[in-house]
Swiss-Prot record:
The gene is ANB1. There is a cross-link at residue 86 (Glycyl lysine isopeptide (Lys-Gly) (interchain with G-Cter in ubiquitin)). The modification Phosphoserine is found at residues 2, 74. The modification Hypusine is found at residue 51. This is Eukaryotic translation initiation factor 5A-2. Homodimer. Binds to 80S ribosomes. Actively translating ribosomes show mutually exclusive binding of eIF5a (HYP2 or ANB1) and EFT1/eEF2. Interacts with DYS1 and LIA1. It comes from Saccharomyces cerevisiae (strain ATCC 204508 / S288c). GO terms for molecular function: ribosome binding; RNA binding; translation elongation factor activity. One of its GO terms (cellular component) is cytosolic ribosome.
């Protein structure tokens, strides 16, 4: 018998959190990874090919989790990583200790998403305190998740 210990931290199938895409194929409102962060492209421009070199693509992006502005300048022929971004809606069950308690469509509970801060968090807490049924939109990319919006759930009378 071997004395080695095997630890498996997470149970994904080894799928990548990103895929490569050529700079020239990126589009405004699309997603891209800049400095290791998943970002949404808010503005992009291309410069002409210079005397020595390639056309450049200038990207202005916002981090999808922090809202921080990040910029990048790359040759149009280079590949950049694009994150797989997933949006899911969950029913809000409770807000406790800064975390959301959510229910998936198949009845499972999910308690590992942080409650949003700032105006979104305050208005979500206020609507929840009023007893409204809320649906929360969660965005997930590259192993991170965050609540980005909420709406009142439709009444099923």
């Amino acid at each position: 018998m071997s004395d080695e210990e095997h630890t498996f931290e997470n149970a994904d199938a080894g799928a990548s959190a990103t895929y490569p895409m050529q700079c020239s194929a990126l589009r405004k409102n699309g997603f891209v990874v800049i400095k290791g962060r998943p970002c949404k492209i808010v503005d992009m421009s291309t410069s002409k090919t210079g005397k020595h070199g390639h056309a450049k693509v200038h990207l202005v992006t916002l981090d999808i989790f922090t809202g921080k502005k990040l910029e990048d300048l790359s040759p149009s022929t280079h590949n950049l990583e694009v994150p797989f971004v997933k949006r899911s809606e969950y029913q809000l069950l409770d807000i406790d200790d800064g975390y959301l308690s959510l229910m998936t469509m198949d009845g499972e509970t999910k308690d590992d998403v942080k409650a949003p801060e700032g105006e979104l968090g305050d208005s979500m807490q206020a609507a929840f305190d009023e007893g409204k049924d809320l649906m929360v939109t969660i965005i997930s990319a590259m192993g991170e998740e965050a609540a980005i919006s909420f709406k009142e759930a439709p009444r099923s009378d």
